[in-house]
């Protein structure tokens, strides 16, 4: 070793750090962020809204179509899978889609997700039997997951930072609107044409979506896929983790559909599936820990308190949200004898004020750069609204069921999009895609968990109430009668007993929602009180630079919360 080498210099007289600095100076500067504006932004957002409308419609459209489906296939034991298959794949595949968006062109991955969704729609629409319909619904869920996750990701890619919160709020409003009108369309198609049109209708809408994606989904130049070999990408997809997560969710779904409804909770198969759910869930987290950076849910991403508290907040907030979304129409149809369409119309206050709350929080976040206060306010208002919904009775007036919807809707809307905004805003650019996938997984798996749990709560408490007031009635007949058909199938004392049983089940589901809303208040207090990073691409004047200094050194802030 020469003296120069020993002293950390080369024969040319430059120290190693000097060379590193020189090389860094010689490198071309990173491209300045370019964001979509004007017509291009409007075209991209229109495409995102249309594809979200398409994907979210099918989450709830099958609910009112189930009576017609069971008339054709005569498989009552498969009823839970017609909706559950979609939810299971949306939740379990979300992190996988996040990885695909990281390593491939966002336009290509988005296009593939839409195509998979449309293929699933064709399979479901043309299904000759129940098994084929379930496969079609699973494919729809798989494609839906990529479309919904990609929609949020594209907003973060193409929109200026100060506009993102507002646009994500608008996107959430479209999502909620779609899930509300889904059952309306499902009921209309099933009554007037055939349930198969619940799926055929996706094709004439999906065609223009594909064309719009091809024409307008151009990602800004500063967003580039991460370089990786095919072997590396395959490892990143974490297929063992995906398989364990999916099978654990299937076990839980089966156990909750059996328990107390078609089989006793003490039945061997019910206990076995619950045990398998626990074992597979533990195995999933063990595999994720072993996989490290290759895990579909990299546990390191969840380490910062800002991340895991927001992810948990989003998970629990959807507990409160989904129960009201699905069981408020059941209340209207069963207790008030309304049609599927009328029940949807009477649920519009919830949807309208959810949209208003979402857009309001997006606007306020853009102005104040605060997050936690809106999550706290969201939890408080949602708790009050859920408590009022719990008080609904058989003879409740319009004012009694519209007022709580307004409070609950604006409450849930205020906080629903905040966790996604927080995680995307505090993530490093290369981590935005997988972080979005993890957040979507939390939101979707909460649907898979809690919608199934709510169905079990509803059925078990309804049957318990029915057994106490009308022990001679056939519980299977009550379970298999559609909510809108209750007043037609039962009369007199039987109808009174069934309505009382339905109300008992619905109130317990609303109590479940109330517990979730109250828990979000507690969770919001654990979320770090931090302002978003400067929402502009870079300081353009002294005032913004000074504001950045007030927030503290950028490097320190990134160390604390960036993922």
UniProtKB/Swiss-Prot annotation:
UniProt entry tagged with the keyword Transmembrane: yes
Subcellular location: Cell membrane
Transmembrane segments: 48-68, 78-98, 108-128, 138-158, 165-185, 197-217, 239-259, 270-290, 312-332, 345-365, 374-394, 406-426, 438-458, 509-529
Positions with biased composition (Basic and acidic residues): 547-563
Keywords, ordered alphabetically: Cell membrane, Membrane, Transmembrane, Transmembrane helix, Transport
Any one annotated GO CC term: plasma membrane
Region feature (Disordered): 1-32, 538-563
Topological type in the membrane: Multi-pass membrane protein
Any one GO molecular-function label of the UniProt entry: transmembrane transporter activity
Biotechnology: Notoamides have been shown to exhibit antitumoral activities. Notoamides A-C show moderate cytotoxicity against HeLa and L1210 cells with IC(50) values in the range of 22-52 mg/ml, but the IC(50) value of notoamide D is greater than 100 mg/ml. Moreover, notoamide C induces G2/M-cell cycle arrest at a concentration of 6.3 mg/ml.
Gene3D superfamilies, sorted: MFS general substrate transporter like domains
A Pfam family reported for this protein in Swiss-Prot or TrEMBL: MFS_1
InterPro entries the UniProt entry points to: MFS, MFS_dom, MFS_trans_sf
Superkingdom field: Eukaryota
Role: Efflux pump; part of the gene cluster that mediates the biosynthesis of notoamide, a fungal indole alkaloid that belongs to a family of natural products containing a characteristic bicyclo[2.2.2]diazaoctane core.
Similarity comment: Belongs to the major facilitator superfamily. TCR/Tet family.
Name this protein carries in UniProt: Efflux pump notK
Higher taxonomy: Eukaryota, Fungi, Dikarya, Ascomycota, Pezizomycotina
Name of the gene: notK
């Amino acid at each position: 070793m020469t003296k120069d080498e020993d002293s950390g210099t080369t024969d040319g007289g430059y120290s190693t750090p000097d060379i590193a600095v020189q090389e860094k100076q010689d490198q071309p500067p990173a491209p300045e962020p370019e964001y979509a504006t004007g017509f291009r932004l409007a075209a991209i957002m229109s495409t995102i809204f249309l594809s979200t409308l398409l994907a979210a419609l099918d989450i709830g459209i099958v609910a009112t179509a189930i009576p017609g489906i069971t008339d054709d296939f005569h498989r009552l034991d498969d009823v839970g899978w017609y909706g559950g298959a979609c939810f299971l794949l949306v939740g379990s595949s979300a992190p996988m889609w996040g990885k695909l968006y990281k390593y491939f062109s966002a336009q290509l991955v988005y296009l593939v997700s839409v195509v998979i969704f449309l293929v699933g729609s064709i399979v479901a629409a043309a299904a000759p039997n129940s098994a084929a319909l379930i496969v079609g619904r699973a494919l729809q869920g798989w494609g839906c997951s990529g479309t919904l996750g990609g929609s949020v990701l594209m907003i973060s890619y193409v929109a200026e930072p100060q506009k993102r919160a507002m646009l994500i709020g608008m996107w959430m409003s479209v999502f909620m609107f779609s899930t509300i009108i889904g059952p309306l369309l499902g009921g209309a198609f099933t009554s007037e044409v055939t349930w198969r049109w619940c799926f055929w209708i996706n094709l004439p809408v999906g065609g223009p979506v594909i064309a719009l994606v091809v024409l307008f989904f151009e990602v800004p130049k500063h967003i580039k896929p991460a370089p990786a070999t095919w072997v590396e990408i395959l490892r990143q997809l974490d297929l063992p983790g995906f398989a364990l997560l999916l099978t654990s969710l299937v076990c839980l779904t089966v156990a909750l559909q059996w328990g107390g409804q078609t089989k006793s909770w003490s039945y061997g198969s019910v206990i076995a599936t619950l045990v398998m759910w626990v074992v597979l869930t533990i195995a999933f987290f063990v595999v994720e820990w072993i996989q490290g950076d290759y895990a579909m849910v990299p546990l390191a991403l969840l380490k910062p308190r800002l991340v895991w508290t927001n992810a948990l907040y989003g998970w629990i907030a959807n507990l409160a949200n989904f129960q009201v979304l699905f069981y408020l129409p059941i209340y209207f149809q069963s207790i008030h004898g309304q049609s599927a369409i009328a029940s949807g119309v009477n649920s519009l206050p919830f949807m309208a004020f959810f949209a208003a709350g979402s857009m309001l929080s997006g606007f306020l976040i853009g102005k104040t750069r605060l997050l936690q206060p809106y999550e706290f306010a969201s939890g408080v208002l949602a708790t009050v609204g859920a408590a009022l919904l719990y008080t609904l009775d058989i003879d409740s007036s319009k004012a009694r069921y519209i007022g709580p919807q307004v409070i609950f809707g604006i409450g849930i809307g205020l906080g629903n999009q905040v966790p996604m905004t927080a995680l995307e805003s505090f993530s490093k650019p290369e981590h935005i895609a997988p972080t979005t996938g993890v957040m979507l997984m939390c939101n979707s798996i909460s649907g898979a968990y809690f919608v199934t749990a709510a169905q079990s709560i509803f059925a078990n408490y309804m049957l318990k109430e029915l057994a106490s007031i009308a022990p001679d009635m056939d519980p299977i007949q009550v379970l298999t009668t559609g909510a809108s058909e209750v007043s037609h199938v039962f009369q007199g004392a039987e109808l009174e007993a069934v309505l009382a049983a339905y109300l008992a089940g619905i109130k317990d589901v609303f109590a479940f929602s109330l517990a979730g809303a109250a828990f979000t208040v507690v969770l919001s207090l654990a979320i770090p009180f931090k302002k978003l990073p400067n929402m502009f691409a870079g300081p353009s004047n002294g005032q913004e630079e000074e504001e950045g200094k007030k927030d503290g050194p950028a490097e320190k802030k990134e160390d604390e919360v960036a993922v």
